[in-house]
């Protein structure tokens, strides 16, 4: 591993822990994503955060996701995350399930394996964090 990769891994570990420290399961390989999605119950809801090293992930996406997961009355059955740019195969596999234009950071909400709601980067970046929280809350209230 070169110095750049080591540095990015160190940063990603800290950024990943903002979610895993709040009970998000980190899916880091294509097999982990496939196994998780294959075994999810048809009535289970899964909130997916596609994490990123960018500023809008740090200042908006991760804090909004954590806030709503912790404070909303209706919650998804599962909370998982993949890390774009770090866990490339896992992210690509999750994007196969999402079937939307690749976007990071982003959020997806599934019921079973069916995508119910997707929030891409362009609906995160540059917006007020309260508005992002409301988008996530509305999706949870509708589908969880």
Curated annotation (Swiss-Prot):
Annotated GO biological processes are: cell redox homeostasis
Q: What highest taxon heads this organism's lineage?
A: Bacteria
The family note in this entry says: Belongs to the bacilliredoxin family.
Which PANTHER family is this protein grouped with?
BACILLIREDOXIN BRXA, UPF0403 PROTEIN YQIW-RELATED
* The protein, known as: Bacilliredoxin SSP1311
